[in-house]
Amino acid sequence: MRSDVIKKGLERAPHRSLLKALGITDDEMRRPFIGIVSSWNEIIPGHVHLDKVVEAVKAGVRMAGGVPFVFPTIGICDGIAMDHRGMKFSLPSRELIADSIEIVASGFPFDGLVFVPNCDKITPGMMMAMGRLNIPSVLISGGPMLAGRYNGRDIDLITVFEAVGGYKVGKVDEETLKAIEDLACPGAGSCAGLFTANTMNSLAEALGIAPRGNGTVPAVHAKRLRMAKEAGMLVVELVKRDVKPRDIVTLDSFMNAVMVDLATGGSTNTVLHLKAIAESFGIDFDIKLFDELSRKIPHICNISPVGPYHIQDLDDAGGIYAVMKRLQENGLLKEDAMTIYLRKIGDLVREAKILNEDVIRPFDNPYHKEGGLGILFGNLAPEGAVAKLSGVPEKMMHHVGPAVVFEDGEEATKAILSGKIKKGDVVVIRYEGPKGGPGMREMLSPTSAIVGMGLAEDVALITDGRFSGGSHGAVIGHVSPEAAEGGPIGIVKDGDLIEIDFEKRTLNLLISDEEFERRMKEFTPLVKEVDSDYLRRYAFFVQSASKGAIFRKP
């Protein structure tokens, strides 16, 4: 066993002595040591209950004959970090999470690992660490929050963000806003729509590294604890058989994950995260795969923020394995991909049942004929940009409008809420990329303001920053190269016409080639003052969003 290096032989007596200080017995020294990394804390709603999930994992490890050891990592709630300096640290925390786990699991040679995340950057950060370490592993998340209820309808956090915009234009009164605020988030779990956290936890199932139901079983359901026990038992079996993450996760696994992402209409952030995770697994993954598959995979799940359903509805309908059954029915699922169950995913999916034909529609009756995400290219995005196609209003699928340029998200939000943005405008927010922000902040407030102000059918937004999984509308993010790296988004001027064609996947600045070249030659990127040692280091090492915003290798 990997842990024998600290357990076996006379020369390891000091190591055993320290382990015995923890209460470890001689009998336990002969068993697999299982590390359990948890992002439990008391400030994130999605993490506040992870201590209970961890206890269930520990029970499962012991049931299977292993010895559990819990260690922590950090976490940030993007919702609470929104609209202030804290959002600059959200994406950078992903790298720190992966690094910290790699350090602990290398310093202590565990035989296996169980990863217990829940929210936006924590799940991908842990998945990156899993790929790097390549120790027998299972991921079990904390699960989604239940939707809130107001005035007879389901609501969630995005309802609150959009109600703020509604209040600004007199569509929502203060009493209603307060009621929505009080009821939208009823308890523990990752926010209830198909936002980044729930998308990533769902894709962990499709990758084969998490138990069935990982992405959809509500946080407060007892089934979540039973799944956690199962995760603890599974990892011990993987240790005994010496099955490692790279034995399970292949390019076919990533293709399954992308197809699930497109079919469900997942978060745009998945493009960024899957690229980074693939890199950690040593897999060559081109983001163009999203666009190639999007032409074949229809959008069949209408889940918030683009539809009325929530994750609990998807769970009731059969969950992610039922979505994969639709792929299987149409001959698209990569059935030979392996799973932590030591069974092929195709065999497991055959056992799944689709329990609601509207929540998980058949391919011949989709919500949209193409998948939920698209990659756009053009003179404004030579390396690509990302859009949530399932959230684009029909009349905005092709749009030409004048640019209104902002150098950060706050100024854009103020302008939108103060009525300075008019129908037809294209809001351009730049210097919000991985290096330029630094930190590639989410632009949830400006997009929610556009929706709340009643402009979603008439205004587009493009940025080198990111979007929350809760953003929707004619919005395009991850524009690469970013402005801080000399990208063309940096040369856009107020009033310039921008053409967006979501069907053709193009994004272009409508100026002459000569004017374009002149501006690019004269362009000197703005350099922002950065008041954080960590963010200065992050900005120095981070690569383009088109490369997953991972660090450059020395």
Curated annotation (Swiss-Prot):
HAMAP family: IlvD. Mg(2+) binds at D78, D120, K121, E442. Keywords: 2Fe-2S, Amino-acid biosynthesis, Branched-chain amino acid biosynthesis, Iron, Iron-sulfur, Lyase, Magnesium, Metal-binding. The keyword Cell membrane does not apply. Belongs to the IlvD/Edd family. Binds 1 [2Fe-2S] cluster per subunit. This cluster acts as a Lewis acid cofactor. It catalyses: (2R)-2,3-dihydroxy-3-methylbutanoate = 3-methyl-2-oxobutanoate + H2O; (2R,3R)-2,3-dihydroxy-3-methylpentanoate = (S)-3-methyl-2-oxopentanoate + H2O. The gene is ilvD. Its EC number is 4.2.1.9. Pfam families: ILV_EDD_C, ILVD_EDD_N. Functions in the biosynthesis of branched-chain amino acids. Catalyzes the dehydration of (2R,3R)-2,3-dihydroxy-3-methylpentanoate (2,3-dihydroxy-3-methylvalerate) into 2-oxo-3-methylpentanoate (2-oxo-3-methylvalerate) and of (2R)-2,3-dihydroxy-3-methylbutanoate (2,3-dihydroxyisovalerate) into 2-oxo-3-methylbutanoate (2-oxoisovalerate), the penultimate precursor to L-isoleucine and L-valine, respectively. Its cofactor is [2Fe-2S] cluster; Mg(2+). Disulfide bonds: none annotated. PROSITE patterns: ILVD_EDD_1, ILVD_EDD_2. The active site is at S468. This is Dihydroxy-acid dehydratase. GO terms for biological process: isoleucine biosynthetic process; L-valine biosynthetic process. SUPFAM superfamilies: IlvD/EDD N-terminal domain-like, LeuD/IlvD-like. Homodimer. The lineage of its organism: Bacteria, Thermotogati, Thermotogota, Thermotogae, Thermotogales. The keyword Iron-sulfur applies. Pathway: Amino-acid biosynthesis; L-isoleucine biosynthesis; L-isoleucine from 2-oxobutanoate: step 3/4; Amino-acid biosynthesis; L-valine biosynthesis; L-valine from pyruvate: step 3/4. GO terms for molecular function: 2 iron, 2 sulfur cluster binding; dihydroxy-acid dehydratase activity; magnesium ion binding. [2Fe-2S] cluster binds at C119, C191. The modification N6-carboxylysine is found at K121. GO terms for cellular component: cytosol. InterPro entries: Dihydro-acid_dehy_C (IPR042096), DihydroxyA_deHydtase (IPR004404), DiOHA_6PGluconate_deHydtase_CS (IPR020558), ILV_EDD_C (IPR056740), ILV_EDD_N (IPR000581), IlvD/EDD_N (IPR037237).
